[in-house]
From Swiss-Prot:
The protein's name: X-ray repair cross-complementing protein 5
Entry's free-text remark on domains: The VWFA domain interacts with the KBM (Ku-binding motif) found in a number of DNA repair proteins.
Stretches assigned to the Ku domain: 253-449
Subunit (UniProt): Heterodimer composed of xrcc5/Ku80 and xrcc6/Ku70.
Presence of keyword Glycoprotein: no
UniProt function note: Single-stranded DNA-dependent ATP-dependent helicase that plays a key role in DNA non-homologous end joining (NHEJ).
Length: 726
């Protein structure tokens, strides 16, 4: 396996006297340069980059470099040699690096950086050697070795970048507002006076000459201002992942096999760093010891060894023991990797709401297999021309469970592949029944209301299209995960400032999550129209449902004593029993259900769930007397649901009950339901129902035709029908 590509980078920072000067109310170039370096290093640390970083400071009060001889290369210090960046380096840049009181030649510092790169990368493999210079160009320099420096940079293939407090663009420097490349935003006036000093102007010419010599006309694209760099580096870099190939054989039937290689295209990114417990005082993980003890559930809490325990599976109220041997025998035994085509279907048969899983895989032909490339290309183009997709069986390896998925043809100018997405099994699909809005005239929108919503949707389009060009106003693929950004921000802050509270969320991150300005402006008028078409009204509190006893109670202005006496006389045993009922029992569940509903502040759904539980318990006995008891409960449930406008709960229950008894030993019970004509609550019985009387009759009718059709579908085994059933 090829090693991960890595670079060697030297950060060469000017810490001379002039770098600490600033205009009133503005940050000095030194502080700006430190911020840029900190952001760059933070990105490298959290991205777990393999790039090695060195730091060279020039303008220091001391000299510490390998080239220092007498009066040469003075006031230049190698602060850190090439190694992976870490929090120690961040802390040093933040707290240790301070401005010096002298100036140093930045070309000498460039030579020291080149020497460090060449010596410390000798015998190692790096994909890139790079030097980044942070300066305000106020330091004097000698041009004696300029041509030698440029020649050595080219020979060693060292790339160069400059980070400055101002632009070096010639037009902008001359006063034009033209912004070219990345050096277009100007942050002038960083020195003690307005504008640039003569030394800085000479430095700009020197930078331009070096960059043009290295990269030609594109050289200035590698010169950045501090302000521009802060904006670009404010987002933490994502963790770099190497593409891991998944070699397999694409099989169609038993005679056609094509070599393929799969790569993950989309998958959920998770934070690799995990939380661990450390001692609050010493901050060391080793000072914490964790022990797990297994005890019996008895008074003595007898301790047992882990080897003397096995797992158990809760099955109702019982626990079924399941040993490791049982688990191994139960596991699905796969033959290994698999990407087998089960069949083909029209792409319109596969709906996007059926996609499941947490990844998208792209299947390519191996680059060194011409026969596989030709065969796979023919399959991809055939699927594309016929508007078809492949339904496939996917197994990652012999330890994995099989998946069923869909493979789409994907053709681009530079490549073509199959895109695999997982599809659900029967148990993965949730079927819900909701009342139709069309059957209730109260909820039918007018033409003006429909038009207002259409206009709002059109105005909130995230695609800008003027007829000639299309632009995505909200590029989600370029949007960083705010969870990661916030986590990295807090970790970095705590690492450098352990005692201070966490900082607020960066404003630039909040701005990224906001609706684009263009969309906000475009939807103002349609929003006003929607508000006018859908006026809000204060919802009145529903009246409490009163019992007949409460409705017909005498309401007179008699003395309290007399009223109390009459209340005592009228206190019935029925109401006393109601007060004692706390749940639906198994003796008289229908009466308990009604008694609970007569109590105030009763949750209908909670009580009905108890009744449904008792109904299923009676059905489990599978005896006629218990069937009749269930019928009585269902009738009571239906009556109370109509009274209290809880139609949906009853209809959902009856539909689920029908599914449960269909094809089982409970068909005798369902025949009783049909004879008693206990069907869904219709719209003629309650306004809250969307079920018509015809639909209620059809609900109780036998469905022989559908059974025959289902049998035919099973015999044919067509993939199109398979997707319809899903």
């Amino acid at each position: 396996m090829a090693r991960a590509a890595k670079s060697a980078v030297v950060l060469c920072m000017d810490v001379g006297l002039a770098m600490s000067h600033s205009n009133q109310g503005k940050e000095s170039p030194f502080e700006q340069a430190k911020k840029v370096m900190m952001l760059f290093l933070q990105r490298q640390v959290f991205a777990e980059s393999k790039d090695e970083i060195a730091v060279v400071l020039y303008g220091t009060d001391t000299t510490d470099n390998a080239l220092a001889r007498e009066d040469q290369y003075e006031n230049i210090s190698v602060h850190r040699h090439l190694m992976l960046p870490d929090f120690d380096l961040l802390e040093q840049i933040e707290n240790v690096v301070e401005p010096g009181s002298v100036q140093a030649d930045f070309l000498d510092a460039l030579i020291v950086s080149m020497d460090l790169l060449q010596k410390e990368t000798l015998g190692k493999k790096y994909t890139r050697l790079h030097i980044a210079v942070f300066s305000d160009l106020s330091s004097p320099f000698s041009v004696d070795q300029l041509e030698v420096i440029i020649a050595n940079l080219k020979k060693a293939e060292i790339t160069l970048q400059f980070f400055l407090p101002f632009s070096v663009d010639e037009e902008e420097f001359g006063g034009s507002s033209n912004n070219r490349g990345n050096a277009g935003s100007s942050d002038r006036g960083c020195g003690p006076g307005k504008g640039l000093s003569d030394q800085q102007k000479e430095g700009i010419e020197m930078v331009r000459k070096i960059m043009f010599s290295l990269d030609g006309e594109e050289g200035l694209s590698e010169v950045f201002t501090f302000r521009d760099s802060l904006e670009r580096l404010s987002i933490f870099k994502k963790i770099e992942r190497r593409p891991m190939p998944w070699p397999c054989q694409l099989t169609v039937g038993s005679s056609l096999s094509i070599r393929i290689v799969g790569y993950k295209s989309v998958t959920e990114e998770k934070v690799k760093k995990t939380w661990t417990h450390i001692d609050a005082k010493t901050h060391k993980k080793e000072d914490i010891k964790k022990e797990t003890v297994y005890c019996l559930n008895n008074d003595e809490e007898t301790e047992v060894e882990k080897d003397d325990t096995i797992q158990g599976f809760r099955y109702g109220s019982d626990i079924v023991p399941f040993s490791k041997v049982d688990q191994e025998q139960m596991k699905y035994k796969s033959e290994g990797k698999c990407f087998a085509v089960l069949g083909f279907t029209k792409s319109s048969m596969v709906l996007s709401n059926q996609f499941v899983g947490n990844q998208v895989i792209r299947m390519f032909a191996p680059s060194d297999d011409e026969a596989a490339s030709v065969a796979l290309s023919a399959l991809i183009h055939a699927l594309d021309e016929m508007d078809m997709v492949a339904i496939v069986r996917y197994v990652y390896d012999r330890r994995s469970n099989p998946q069923v998925g869909v493979a789409f043809p994907h053709i681009k100018d530079k490549y073509e592949c199959l895109v695999y997405v997982q599809l659900p099994f029967m148990e993965d699909i949730r079927q819900y029944l909701f009342s139709s809005l069309k059957n209730n005239k109260k909820f039918t929108p007018t033409e003006s209301q429909n038009s207002a919503i259409d206009s709002l949707i059109d105005s909130m389009s995230l695609i800008y299209d003027d007829g000639e060009t299309k632009e995505d106003l909200f590029k989600t693929s370029k949007l960083p995960n705010p969870q990661f950004q916030r986590l990295f921000q807090c970790l970095q802050h705590k690492a450098l400032n352990p005692e201070s509270p966490l900082p607020p969320i960066d404003q630039h991150l909040l701005d990224m999550l906001e609706t684009p300005v263009e969309v906000k402006e475009a939807c103002m008028a349609p929003l006003a129209t929607v508000k006018a078409c859908f006026p809000l009204q204060e919802a009145t509190k529903r009246k409490e449902v009163k019992t007949a006893d409460e409705i017909f109670t005498k309401k007179t202005d008699e003395p309290d004593a007399k009223k109390l006496k009459e209340d005592d006389e009228g206190f019935s045993l029925l109401r006393l029993a109601d007060g004692n009922v706390t749940s639906v029992g198994s003796v008289n569940p229908d009466q308990d259900f009604q008694a609970l509903l007569r109590q105030k502040n009763t949750d209908f759904k909670h009580v009905s769930d108890q009744l449904i539980k008792r109904i299923y318990e009676c059905l489990d006995v599978k005896q006629t007397q218990y069937y009749m008891k269930s019928i009585l409960c269902i009738k009571t449930f239906r009556e109370e649901a109509i009274k209290l406008s809880q139609v949906r709960l009853f209809n959902d229950f009856l539909q689920l009950l029908k599914q449960k008894v269909d094809g089982s030993a409970l068909m005798e019970f369902w025949d009783i339901i049909v004879q008693e004509e206990i069907s869904l609550i219709t719209s003629s019985e309650s306004k809250g129902s969307s079920v018509t009387p015809e639909e209620a009759k059809q609900f109780l009718a036998q469905k022989e035709e559908k059974v025959e059709e289902a049998a035919m579908m099973e015999d044919e085994g067509d993939v199109d029908d398979l997707l319809d059933m899903m």
